[in-house]
From Swiss-Prot:
Native source species: Arabidopsis thaliana (Mouse-ear cress)
Assigned keywords, A-Z: Leucine-rich repeat, Repeat
LRR repeats: 128-160, 162-187, 188-214, 234-260, 278-309, 324-352
UniProt xrefs under PROSITE patterns: FBOX
Name of the molecule in the record: F-box/FBD/LRR-repeat protein At2g26030
Length: 442
């Protein structure tokens, strides 16, 4: 589209186009012509990084923009601070103004100038009928003094956010979000021994996607998490600190990404035969997610399940058709034990790590899925010539009855021209499924 065609467009359409640009780029269009000089000021979006401004000119820029649009509704307000500039006094005021003007998308990213200082958001964010998405990073939120009402909020992302006054503040907020679908919560590291959601309760009838990250705590505080979301389809669970984990009503769960030690090793007690409480927590968690169809599981989670499986059997995952697991040479027997709990598995992806740990005993046991359902295996980060990796390849070729495809992703790109030698070596391996195709990817 040439310049003449663009100039024929109405102002309403041009401002809509400019709304997809960062404000600093939208301003640059003011030099195009007299018509464009103030057009950017009518864009209902303010998207800024303070690093784009010299000194503290960004503050007066925002004030002037909001003053010019005093009678206009705001669609989006996005402000990102950096380590050199952080205005503790103005952010909350700007949020008040934009919320009062019917903001739909609010994105505020603070910065830690002092590890134990946060600017707290105004309470009018709890009574915003128009807010659709809310992202808060490195700020604070207070206990609402009234019933939360966010009837339009569908997306909420809270990262490194401090919470004062009430350990159940998150339950109050979520209860006021009747259409919330996507929730990300990354708990802050409590260097200052402040409350960082000791009791996290996520109860929602609308939630479809939830990502929880809580990796590290320096205090000896007791933490617990409860998730009750019958419509949840995706769960990313990365929590190493909670002593109590309750997950229930996961009947809609389709995909889960687990990276957790269940407080078994780091910062917690080891899983011993007499530790019935911790064992039951793991059992109830696995049982609650047993309807899942697609699972990604980390190496350290598998290591915890190795201990668990020596005490009681791992629950069955009858619906699981796709599994991605991180394994090393010392975990191959554990992998087979876990695969036995996946009787209908069709696709298996292994992120293989060559470690210095001793290799476990030979691969002799054959899980049910290899005999009846497993159609595709992908092994990543393989090093040709490495003994354990080759054993793994031999094992799947020898024991997979209905295998259609074996994909080998090689780590060493220096052997890219040696495919013929690799295929020649693979041709000596016993192949249970005659229709199996071996694919090598560098």
């Amino acid at each position: 589209m040439n310049c003449d065609r663009i100039c024929e467009l109405p102002d309403s359409l041009l401002t809509q186009v400019l709304s997809y640009l960062p404000t600093i780029d939208s301003v640059k269009t003011s030099v195009l012509s007299k018509r464009w000089e103030f057009l950017w000021l009518r864009v209902p979006v303010l998207d800024l990084k303070v690093s784009d401004f010299p000194d503290e000119n960004y503050a007066s820029f925002i004030d002037n923009f909001l003053e010019f649009n005093r009678k206009s509704r705001m669609r989006k307000f996005k402000l990102k601070y950096d380590e050199y500039t952080y205005d503790d006094d103005r952010l909350a005021g700007w949020v008040v103004t934009t919320v009062d003007r019917g903001i739909q998308h609010l994105d505020a990213k603070g910065f830690e100038t002092n590890m134990c200082v946060r600017e707290f958001m105004p309470q009018n964010i709890y009574k915003c009928n128009t807010l659709v998405s809310l992202m808060l990073v490195t700020v604070g939120i207070e206990n609402p003094e009234f019933v939360v009402s966010l009837p339009s909020l569908k997306i909420m992302h809270l990262e490194d956010v401090w919470y004062y006054d009430d350990p159940l503040i998150m339950e109050k907020i979520i209860s006021g979000c009747p259409v919330l679908e996507d929730f990300v919560l990354i708990r802050p590291i409590d260097f200052c021994n402040l409350d960082v959601l000791q009791f996290l309760r996520v109860r929602s009838l609308s939630l479809r996607s939830f990502r929880l990250t809580f990796e590290y705590s320096v205090s000896c505080t007791y933490f617990s998490v409860e998730i009750d979301a019958p419509r949840l389809e995706y769960l990313n669970f990365n929590d190493d600190q909670s002593d109590t984990i309750v997950v229930k009503n996961m009947t809609s769960l389709s995909m889960i990404d687990i990276d957790s030690e269940f407080n078994v090793k780091f910062g917690g007690s080891r899983l011993e035969p007499g530790d019935l409480r911790k064992r039951d927590i793991i059992r109830d968690f696995l049982t609650a997610i047993s309807c899942v169809r697609h699972m990604i599981i980390s190496r350290r989670t598998l290591e915890v399940l190795d201990r668990y499986s020596k005490l009681v059997p791992i629950p069955k995952f009858d619906n699981l058709y796709r599994l991605q697991a991180a394994v090393s040479r010392s975990m191959l027997q554990l992998l087979l034990v876990f695969l036995e709990s996946c009787p209908n598995l069709e696709n298996l992806i292994l992120d293989f790590t060559v470690s210095t740990e001793p290799e476990q005993d030979g691969l002799t046991y054959v899980p049910q899925c290899l005999l009846s359902s497993l159609e595709c295996v992908e092994i990543r980060e393989l090093i040709m010539g490495e003994e354990t990796g080759e054993k793994l390849v031999r094992y799947f070729l020898k024991n997979s009855v209905v295998l259609k495809k074996l994909i080998l992703r090689l780590e060493d790109s220096s052997i890219a021209n040696q495919d013929s030698d690799i295929f020649k070596e693979l041709s000596t391996f016993t192949k249970r499924s005659r229709s199996c195709e071996v694919i090598i990817i560098h």
